[in-house]
């Protein structure tokens, strides 16, 4: 009663309200922490605005009565939606008037009387402590009214009450328009739109990334296929290589020739600039050896001999080899002749030796005969000595002739 006096409510009680008051006290044994809101006429002048209460997975309505009270319906537990609640206009006014009862929110008393709360008042007393209600705060000891909130003007409260009463059947009241604040009490507005748009933005970003990655893969495949087709290996035939060498020589050598100019001179549809460039590099490294001159110090190119030069070199080397073989044969012949001359000389020497041996044997016989025939005349002895001397001279003359002939032959060779 003190809180009602603080808010300026009158203490006069109507007959119907007093009868309901006595019946409730008898039924619930006069609860000590119960709170009674009185004065029907005063509340008609200063009605309390009714609003929807939502929090988490529960929801409920605040129903107005004919006397201007706001009846707090139960917040549906276990995830019951607002659509399961009946509209405001479907409840009769007589029933709303009969349900203008004190706000009692003590959970311990509800637990002690589970069977007595089966009637429609059970939903009224099963009010959640976690649900925020404007100008009302539920506590374990009861429901207290926040005295710091200022009340609106009487005309605004009266208009809101009239609008709540005049709601048609089958349609729900627009609480955001009636209360003028859709951000704080609209359950749909508790979740800001940017948070709702975040998954959509993520999905669109992922789709864009997938599209970009697929496009990159397609472009990479196309570029790789184009490079592969442009850089296919080509077999250089001897005829094509000869044409390449002629084109390089026409352009002034491998250092001055460019792949583009060589490609124009070749005029082969199967060739590309990559083929000509690689072949030109190989031609430079294989066919030319850079050398530095002693005077200028600039690199000089020494061209390899062509096929004709190689053939001429082969002919020259073969001629030289044949000449060397001929000389070797001649030397061998001369050596063979010398061997024959030496053999003939050796035979002559042996012959002369045998002849001398015969002469010595004859002389020995003559001496023996002299000793045996001491009586022989000196003329016979002188004749024998003269024969021996003549034989020796002939032998020496023959030897000298053979030696001089062999010397002449050696000199001629």
Swiss-Prot record:
Gene3D superfamilies for the chain: Homeodomain-like
Cellular compartment(s): Nucleus
Upregulating conditions: Not up-regulated by Pi starvation.
Keyword Disulfide bond listed: no
Region (Coiled coil): 322-342
GO molecular function: DNA binding; DNA-binding transcription factor activity
GO cellular component: nucleus
Chain intervals for the UniProt region annotation (Disordered): 171-196, 208-233, 363-413
Keyword presence, Transcription regulation: yes
Ranges of compositional bias, category Polar residues: 181-191, 208-231, 369-383, 396-405
Disrupted gene: phenotype observed: No effect on phosphate starvation responsiveness, due to the redundancy with PHR1.
Tissues in which the UniProt entry reports expression: Expressed in shoots and roots.
Subunit structure: Homodimers and heterodimers. Interacts with MED25. Does not interact with PHL2 or PHL3.
Family: Belongs to the MYB-CC family.
NCBIfam families with a match to the protein in the record: myb_SHAQKYF
Protein function: Transcription factor acting as central integrator of phosphate starvation responses. Regulates FER1 expression upon phosphate starvation, linking iron and phosphate homeostasis.
Designated name of the protein: Protein PHR1-LIKE 1
Organism of derivation: Arabidopsis thaliana
């Amino acid at each position: 009663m003190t809180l009602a006096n603080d808010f300026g409510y009158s203490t006069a009680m109507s007959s119907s309200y007093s009868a309901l008051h006595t019946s409730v006290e008898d039924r619930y044994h006069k609860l000590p922490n119960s709170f009674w809101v009185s004065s029907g006429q005063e509340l008609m002048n200063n009605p309390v605005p009714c609003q929807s209460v939502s929090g988490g997975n529960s929801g409920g309505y605040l129903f107005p009565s004919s006397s201007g009270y706001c009846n707090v319906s139960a917040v549906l537990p276990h995830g019951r939606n607002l659509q399961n609640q009946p509209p405001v206009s479907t409840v009769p006014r007589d029933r709303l008037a009969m349900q203008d009862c004190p706000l009692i929110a003590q959970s311990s008393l509800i637990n002690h009387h589970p069977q007595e709360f089966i009637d429609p008042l059970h939903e009224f007393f099963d009010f959640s402590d976690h649900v925020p209600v404007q100008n009302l705060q539920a506590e374990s000891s009861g429901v207290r009214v926040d005295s710091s909130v200022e009340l609106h003007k009487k005309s605004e409260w009266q208009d809101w009450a009239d609008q709540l009463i005049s709601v048609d059947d089958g349609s729900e009241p627009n609480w955001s328009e009636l209360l003028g604040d859709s951000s704080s009490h609209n359950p749909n507005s508790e979740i800001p739109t940017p948070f709702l748009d975040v998954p959509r933005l993520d999905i669109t970003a992922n789709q864009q990334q997938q599209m970009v990655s697929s496009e990159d893969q397609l472009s990479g495949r196309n570029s790789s296929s184009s490079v592969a087709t442009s850089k296919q290996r080509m077999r250089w035939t001897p005829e094509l290589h000869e044409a390449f060498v002629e084109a390089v020589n026409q352009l002034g050598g491998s250092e001055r020739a460019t792949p583009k100019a060589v490609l124009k001179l070749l005029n082969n549809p199967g060739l590309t600039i990559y083929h000509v460039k690689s072949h030109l590099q190989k031609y430079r490294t294989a066919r030319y050896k850079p050398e530095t001159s002693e005077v200028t110090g600039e690199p000089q190119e020494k061209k390899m001999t062509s096929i004709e030069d190689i053939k001429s070199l082969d002919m020259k080397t073969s001629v030289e080899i044949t000449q060397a073989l001929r000389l070797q044969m001649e030397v061998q012949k001369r050596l063979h002749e010398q061997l024959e001359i030496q053999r003939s000389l050796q035979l002559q020497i042996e012959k002369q030796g045998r002849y001398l041996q015969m002469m010595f044997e004859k002389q020995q016989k003559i001496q023996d005969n002299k000793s045996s025939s001491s009586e022989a005349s000196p003329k016979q002895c002188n004749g024998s000595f003269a024969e021996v001397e003549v034989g020796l001279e002939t032998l020496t003359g023959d030897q000298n002739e053979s030696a001089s002939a062999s010397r002449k032959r050696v000199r001629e060779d």
